């Protein structure tokens, strides 16, 4: 499944996020919550929501061209697996965000869930608002660098 769209949600007092209804079937077999490595200037940190199969594929592809004995491989491997958490949707279609991921992404109660192709991303709503406005301004320049027009 390709994850698309933007949805505003609120975490409950136990840091549970209700998954948007259109994605529940795709995530029914399990969920990996993971810290998203941010590489874009000004991008707020986020949590990614993956299917286990998609996350394993992402991790494998990320590590594929590195020597398993290199320091870079070990650092990436640690990040990918130490900053992720296996879980399942509960009966109310929620996932509990563990404290270490809440802290990593600096999430408050109000969040934005965005489709990012292979996964969903969860951002703090106030931090995401300024970032999304900035990205909209930069899209034409980014696309032009690759010979495309938006």
Could you describe each region identified by the protein language model?
Residues 1-9, 13, 23-87, 91-92, ...:
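Flexible "stalk/tail and boundary" regions
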